[in-house]
Amino acid sequence: MDRTATASWEVMSRRGEQQQQLMMQAPASHNGGSGGGEPARSRWAPKPEQILILESIFNSGMVNPAKDETARIRRLLERFGAVRDANVFYWFQNRRSRSRRRARQLQQACGAALHQLPSAAAAAGAGGGGDYYHHHHQPSSSPFLMHGGGGGGVVTSTTAAPAVAASGHFLADEVDGGGDDDLFAISRQMGLMARHGGGDHHYSSYADSDATQLSYQPTGTIQVFINGVAYDVPSGGALDMAGTFGRDAMLVHSSGEVLPVDEHGVLINSLQMGECYYLVSKSI
Protein backbone atom coordinates (compact mmCIF):
# COMPACT_ATOMS: atom_id res chain seq x y z
CA MET A 1 0.00 0.00 0.00
CA ASP A 2 2.80 2.36 0.86
CA ARG A 3 4.53 1.53 -2.39
CA THR A 4 1.38 2.29 -4.39
CA ALA A 5 0.92 5.64 -2.65
CA THR A 6 4.55 6.51 -3.17
CA ALA A 7 4.36 5.66 -6.88
CA SER A 8 1.19 7.75 -7.29
CA TRP A 9 2.83 10.67 -5.52
CA GLU A 10 5.86 10.46 -7.79
CA VAL A 11 3.63 10.40 -10.91
CA MET A 12 1.70 13.44 -9.69
CA SER A 13 4.92 15.26 -8.89
CA ARG A 14 6.32 14.61 -12.35
CA ARG A 15 3.08 15.81 -13.96
CA GLY A 16 3.17 18.95 -11.86
CA GLU A 17 6.73 19.66 -12.88
CA GLN A 18 5.88 19.10 -16.55
CA GLN A 19 2.90 21.47 -16.36
CA GLN A 20 5.03 24.09 -14.64
CA GLN A 21 7.68 23.80 -17.35
CA LEU A 22 5.02 24.12 -20.06
CA MET A 23 3.62 27.24 -18.39
CA MET A 24 7.10 28.77 -18.22
CA GLN A 25 7.83 27.94 -21.86
CA ALA A 26 4.52 29.28 -23.21
CA PRO A 27 5.33 33.00 -22.82
CA ALA A 28 8.82 32.46 -24.18
CA SER A 29 7.48 30.68 -27.27
CA HIS A 30 4.89 33.44 -27.74
CA ASN A 31 7.53 36.14 -27.58
CA GLY A 32 9.79 34.16 -29.83
CA GLY A 33 6.99 33.82 -32.37
CA SER A 34 6.44 37.55 -32.48
CA GLY A 35 10.13 38.33 -32.80
CA GLY A 36 11.17 35.30 -34.83
CA GLY A 37 9.09 36.21 -37.88
CA GLU A 38 10.03 38.75 -40.50
CA PRO A 39 12.66 41.07 -39.02
CA ALA A 40 11.78 44.73 -38.58
CA ARG A 41 12.75 46.68 -41.65
CA SER A 42 15.25 49.40 -41.02
CA ARG A 43 14.38 52.95 -42.03
CA TRP A 44 15.51 53.85 -45.54
CA ALA A 45 18.45 56.25 -45.49
CA PRO A 46 18.76 57.79 -48.98
CA LYS A 47 22.21 58.64 -50.25
CA PRO A 48 23.12 62.26 -51.08
CA GLU A 49 22.77 61.59 -54.81
CA GLN A 50 19.31 60.11 -54.28
CA ILE A 51 18.27 63.09 -52.14
CA LEU A 52 19.51 65.48 -54.82
CA ILE A 53 17.41 63.75 -57.48
CA LEU A 54 14.33 63.58 -55.24
CA GLU A 55 14.62 67.25 -54.27
CA SER A 56 15.09 68.27 -57.91
CA ILE A 57 11.97 66.37 -58.95
CA PHE A 58 9.97 67.81 -56.05
CA ASN A 59 11.13 71.37 -56.77
CA SER A 60 10.22 70.97 -60.45
CA GLY A 61 6.56 70.65 -59.40
CA MET A 62 6.04 66.88 -59.19
CA VAL A 63 5.06 66.75 -55.51
CA ASN A 64 2.72 63.75 -55.68
CA PRO A 65 3.93 61.36 -58.41
CA ALA A 66 1.58 58.71 -59.74
CA LYS A 67 2.34 55.01 -59.47
CA ASP A 68 4.09 54.80 -62.85
CA GLU A 69 6.11 57.95 -62.12
CA THR A 70 7.07 56.52 -58.73
CA ALA A 71 8.41 53.42 -60.49
CA ARG A 72 10.42 55.61 -62.91
CA ILE A 73 11.90 57.58 -60.03
CA ARG A 74 12.75 54.36 -58.20
CA ARG A 75 14.60 52.99 -61.25
CA LEU A 76 16.58 56.22 -61.46
CA LEU A 77 17.47 56.10 -57.76
CA GLU A 78 18.54 52.45 -57.95
CA ARG A 79 21.67 53.53 -59.80
CA PHE A 80 22.99 54.84 -56.48
CA GLY A 81 21.62 52.33 -53.99
CA ALA A 82 18.81 49.97 -53.08
CA VAL A 83 15.37 51.57 -52.94
CA ARG A 84 11.75 50.40 -53.12
CA ASP A 85 8.63 52.04 -54.53
CA ALA A 86 7.29 52.40 -50.99
CA ASN A 87 10.41 54.35 -50.00
CA VAL A 88 9.82 56.82 -52.83
CA PHE A 89 6.11 57.14 -51.98
CA TYR A 90 6.73 57.85 -48.30
CA TRP A 91 9.59 60.26 -49.08
CA PHE A 92 7.27 62.45 -51.15
CA GLN A 93 4.57 62.15 -48.50
CA ASN A 94 6.95 63.34 -45.76
CA ARG A 95 8.37 66.03 -48.04
CA ARG A 96 4.90 67.46 -48.68
CA SER A 97 4.27 67.53 -44.93
CA ARG A 98 7.50 69.47 -44.36
CA SER A 99 6.58 71.93 -47.11
CA ARG A 100 3.16 72.57 -45.59
CA ARG A 101 4.71 73.04 -42.17
CA ARG A 102 7.23 75.52 -43.55
CA ALA A 103 4.48 77.35 -45.41
CA ARG A 104 2.55 77.74 -42.16
CA GLN A 105 5.65 78.99 -40.38
CA LEU A 106 6.33 81.52 -43.15
CA GLN A 107 2.72 82.65 -43.05
CA GLN A 108 2.94 83.20 -39.32
CA ALA A 109 6.23 85.05 -39.71
CA CYS A 110 4.75 87.27 -42.43
CA GLY A 111 1.75 88.02 -40.23
CA ALA A 112 4.04 89.07 -37.41
CA ALA A 113 6.12 91.18 -39.78
CA LEU A 114 3.07 93.17 -40.90
CA HIS A 115 2.99 94.84 -37.50
CA GLN A 116 6.62 95.92 -37.90
CA LEU A 117 6.35 97.48 -41.38
CA PRO A 118 6.21 101.13 -40.24
CA SER A 119 9.35 100.85 -38.13
CA ALA A 120 11.12 98.81 -40.81
CA ALA A 121 10.29 101.40 -43.46
CA ALA A 122 11.59 104.19 -41.25
CA ALA A 123 14.81 102.26 -40.61
CA ALA A 124 15.27 101.64 -44.34
CA GLY A 125 14.80 105.34 -45.07
CA ALA A 126 17.35 106.31 -42.46
CA GLY A 127 19.84 103.72 -43.68
CA GLY A 128 19.85 104.95 -47.27
CA GLY A 129 19.93 102.84 -50.41
CA GLY A 130 23.22 101.04 -49.88
CA ASP A 131 21.61 97.68 -49.26
CA TYR A 132 19.39 98.07 -52.30
CA TYR A 133 22.40 98.80 -54.50
CA HIS A 134 24.31 95.85 -53.07
CA HIS A 135 21.39 93.53 -53.70
CA HIS A 136 20.70 94.60 -57.25
CA HIS A 137 24.29 95.07 -58.43
CA GLN A 138 26.06 91.92 -57.32
CA PRO A 139 28.56 90.53 -59.83
CA SER A 140 27.16 87.67 -61.87
CA SER A 141 28.47 84.14 -61.42
CA SER A 142 30.52 82.59 -64.17
CA PRO A 143 28.41 80.82 -66.84
CA PHE A 144 28.99 77.24 -67.88
CA LEU A 145 31.21 76.65 -70.90
CA MET A 146 30.00 75.05 -74.10
CA HIS A 147 32.15 73.15 -76.58
CA GLY A 148 32.95 74.99 -79.78
CA GLY A 149 30.50 77.78 -79.09
CA GLY A 150 32.81 80.79 -79.43
CA GLY A 151 31.92 83.92 -77.53
CA GLY A 152 28.22 82.99 -77.31
CA GLY A 153 28.75 79.38 -76.37
CA VAL A 154 27.80 79.58 -72.73
CA VAL A 155 25.12 78.22 -70.48
CA THR A 156 23.36 80.74 -68.30
CA SER A 157 21.00 80.08 -65.44
CA THR A 158 17.62 81.80 -65.23
CA THR A 159 18.33 82.01 -61.50
CA ALA A 160 21.78 82.62 -60.14
CA ALA A 161 23.54 79.96 -58.13
CA PRO A 162 25.42 81.29 -55.08
CA ALA A 163 28.97 80.08 -54.62
CA VAL A 164 29.85 77.84 -51.71
CA ALA A 165 33.23 76.95 -50.27
CA ALA A 166 35.50 75.35 -52.85
CA SER A 167 37.16 72.03 -52.20
CA GLY A 168 39.27 69.50 -54.06
CA HIS A 169 36.33 67.20 -54.74
CA PHE A 170 33.34 67.40 -57.04
CA LEU A 171 30.97 66.62 -54.20
CA ALA A 172 31.18 68.46 -50.90
CA ASP A 173 32.78 66.52 -48.07
CA GLU A 174 30.75 68.03 -45.29
CA VAL A 175 27.05 68.71 -44.80
CA ASP A 176 25.87 71.40 -42.43
CA GLY A 177 23.61 70.22 -39.63
CA GLY A 178 20.25 71.87 -39.58
CA GLY A 179 17.78 69.64 -37.81
CA ASP A 180 15.24 67.28 -39.30
CA ASP A 181 13.77 69.93 -41.60
CA ASP A 182 17.07 70.88 -43.20
CA LEU A 183 16.97 68.11 -45.78
CA PHE A 184 18.13 70.62 -48.39
CA ALA A 185 21.58 70.80 -46.79
CA ILE A 186 22.99 67.86 -48.72
CA SER A 187 21.55 69.08 -51.99
CA ARG A 188 22.87 72.58 -51.42
CA GLN A 189 26.37 71.25 -50.80
CA MET A 190 26.29 69.06 -53.93
CA GLY A 191 26.90 72.08 -56.18
CA LEU A 192 27.60 72.27 -59.86
CA MET A 193 31.29 72.82 -60.62
CA ALA A 194 32.43 75.32 -63.25
CA ARG A 195 36.02 75.93 -64.31
CA HIS A 196 36.87 79.58 -64.79
CA GLY A 197 40.15 81.46 -64.63
CA GLY A 198 42.21 78.34 -63.93
CA GLY A 199 40.48 77.53 -60.63
CA ASP A 200 37.65 75.26 -59.56
CA HIS A 201 34.54 76.94 -58.18
CA HIS A 202 31.53 75.15 -56.80
CA TYR A 203 28.11 76.58 -57.43
CA SER A 204 25.02 75.43 -55.62
CA SER A 205 22.39 73.71 -57.75
CA TYR A 206 19.64 75.56 -55.94
CA ALA A 207 19.06 79.27 -56.45
CA ASP A 208 19.02 81.59 -53.49
CA SER A 209 16.07 83.93 -53.28
CA ASP A 210 18.35 86.94 -52.81
CA ALA A 211 20.78 86.13 -55.63
CA THR A 212 20.87 88.27 -58.75
CA GLN A 213 19.58 86.86 -62.00
CA LEU A 214 21.95 86.11 -64.84
CA SER A 215 21.15 87.49 -68.26
CA TYR A 216 19.57 85.31 -70.94
CA GLN A 217 21.29 84.60 -74.22
CA PRO A 218 19.39 86.73 -76.74
CA THR A 219 19.02 84.22 -79.57
CA GLY A 220 19.79 80.64 -80.50
CA THR A 221 19.24 79.16 -77.04
CA ILE A 222 17.04 76.48 -75.54
CA GLN A 223 16.00 75.99 -71.94
CA VAL A 224 16.82 72.81 -69.99
CA PHE A 225 16.66 71.89 -66.32
CA ILE A 226 19.81 70.71 -64.53
CA ASN A 227 19.29 69.59 -60.93
CA GLY A 228 15.95 71.39 -60.85
CA VAL A 229 17.33 74.74 -62.06
CA ALA A 230 16.43 76.18 -65.49
CA TYR A 231 19.38 77.00 -67.75
CA ASP A 232 19.58 78.55 -71.22
CA VAL A 233 22.02 76.63 -73.42
CA PRO A 234 22.95 77.24 -77.07
CA SER A 235 20.73 75.28 -79.41
CA GLY A 236 23.77 74.11 -81.39
CA GLY A 237 26.88 72.45 -80.02
CA ALA A 238 27.37 69.86 -77.32
CA LEU A 239 28.16 70.57 -73.69
CA ASP A 240 31.84 70.27 -72.73
CA MET A 241 31.38 68.14 -69.62
CA ALA A 242 35.09 67.79 -68.82
CA GLY A 243 35.81 71.49 -69.22
CA THR A 244 32.69 72.62 -67.37
CA PHE A 245 32.15 70.13 -64.57
CA GLY A 246 35.34 68.05 -64.53
CA ARG A 247 36.15 64.51 -65.65
CA ASP A 248 34.36 63.02 -62.64
CA ALA A 249 30.94 64.41 -63.59
CA MET A 250 28.20 62.96 -65.74
CA LEU A 251 24.70 64.02 -66.78
CA VAL A 252 21.75 61.67 -66.27
CA HIS A 253 18.45 62.20 -68.08
CA SER A 254 15.27 62.08 -66.01
CA SER A 255 14.48 58.73 -67.65
CA GLY A 256 17.62 57.28 -66.04
CA GLU A 257 19.77 57.26 -69.19
CA VAL A 258 23.36 58.43 -68.78
CA LEU A 259 24.36 60.88 -71.53
CA PRO A 260 27.43 59.54 -73.39
CA VAL A 261 30.56 61.63 -73.94
CA ASP A 262 33.48 61.28 -76.34
CA GLU A 263 37.16 60.82 -75.45
CA HIS A 264 37.50 64.57 -74.84
CA GLY A 265 34.68 64.66 -72.31
CA VAL A 266 32.21 66.37 -74.67
CA LEU A 267 28.59 65.22 -74.87
CA ILE A 268 27.98 63.28 -78.08
CA ASN A 269 24.41 64.57 -78.37
CA SER A 270 23.07 68.04 -77.66
CA LEU A 271 20.72 68.68 -74.76
CA GLN A 272 17.02 68.69 -75.61
CA MET A 273 14.65 71.61 -75.10
CA GLY A 274 12.69 71.46 -71.83
CA GLU A 275 14.23 68.18 -70.66
CA CYS A 276 15.36 67.50 -67.08
CA TYR A 277 18.91 66.34 -66.32
CA TYR A 278 20.79 65.53 -63.13
CA LEU A 279 24.48 66.21 -62.56
CA VAL A 280 26.12 63.45 -60.51
CA SER A 281 29.59 62.11 -59.84
CA LYS A 282 31.05 59.00 -61.50
CA SER A 283 33.02 58.07 -58.39
CA ILE A 284 29.97 56.96 -56.39
Curated annotation (Swiss-Prot):
InterPro entries, alphabetized: HD (IPR001356), Homeodomain-like_sf (IPR009057), WOX11-like (IPR044558)
PROSITE patterns: HOMEOBOX_2
GO biological process: adventitious root development
Record's subcellular location: Nucleus
Any one GO molecular-function label of the UniProt entry: DNA-binding transcription factor activity
Major localisation: nucleus
Region Disordered, residue ranges: 1-43
Protein keywords: Developmental protein, DNA-binding, Homeobox, Nucleus, Transcription, Transcription regulation
One Pfam family from the record: Homeodomain
Superkingdom of origin: Eukaryota
Gene3D superfamilies, per database record: Homeodomain-like
SMART domains: HOX
A Gene Ontology term for the protein's cellular component: nucleus
Annotated family: Belongs to the WUS homeobox family.
Cited function: Transcription factor which may be involved in developmental processes.
Protein name: WUSCHEL-related homeobox 10
Source species: Oryza sativa subsp. japonica (Rice)
Phylogenetic placement of the source organism: Eukaryota, Viridiplantae, Streptophyta, Embryophyta, Tracheophyta
Gene: WOX10
